Amino acid sequence: MSTKMLSLLLAAAFSFTRADASLSYSSAEEIVKYCTPRDAGTPRGEIAANRILDMVSSTGADARKDSFFARTPLGRRRFNNVYAEFEANPTSSWVVVVSHFDTKSGIVCPGANDGASTTGLLIGLANALVDRPIKNINVMLIWTDGEESLYSYGENDGLQGSIRAVSNIEALKRNVKAVICVDMLGDKDLNAIIPANGTKELTEKVLSVAASLGLSSIVSKSNVHVKDDHQPFLDRGFPAVNIIDFSYGPKNSWWHTSSDTMDKISEESLFKAGSLVAGVISSLAID
């Protein structure tokens, strides 16, 4: 399909509006203001999950919280994921969009970009899906706890929320067409990459949609591998892709620091990121 033809089809399909971007930004702001810190598998993390549940529900979406225990290097901890499902047709396949909300433990980190930005983005997407339901494909949004590792990624350290989500989706026997993991996409100087550890066809899909939306200058394919919430899906055979901006501040110096604050992210970047994700969902519905 040509870029021009895809552009025309996407223009008539599911869209992400400026109002959705505004909600995304204000939601991120609320998370940072009231839920910092929100370290993985902690009572503060559960406070954040409850607030996310309330914010998603306020869009009119049918949201639920899944609380579970998982092992960590510091023993068993209680984690909390939040889900919202938008079923267009029981026989249609599913697109899963996932973002973590937790912050890195052991440091003072507001996590405005790393966690809150795409948490807000998914709330904006929930609002869009309630307001403008998409046809021909079902969408599941997942806000995960436990993406961040306590020490370093390894067995029982990090990705607990996405590992749990994979198990739930397998138990439901959902026909998943694509998993899109979004992370750190609020950066005012947005430069998103698609890491090498992703499904090739989905990577090309994201690049094609970015081109059709005039976003090629801020979305590119990378040779690096990134450990993120898409990895457990890949490990279980689901087609998955990660969209992440891993150049946050000079030499990524704002990442996992007290400098990860709201003044570093923008509504405009969330609008571009939301438009890209909505475009990919629409393109998958057209296929």
Predicted regions and their residues:
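A non-catalytic alpha/beta surface segment that caps or lines the substrate-entry region
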Residues: E29-E87
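Proline/glycine-enriched tight loop/beta-turn segments at coil->beta junctions
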Residues: A88-W94
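Sec-dependent N-terminal signal peptides
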Residues: M5-F14
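N-terminal capping segment at the start of a domain
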Residues: F16, D20-I47, T59, D102-T103, ...
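Structural recognition of the beta-strand scaffold that forms the well-ordered cores
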Residues: K65, Y83, W94-V98, M140-W143, ...
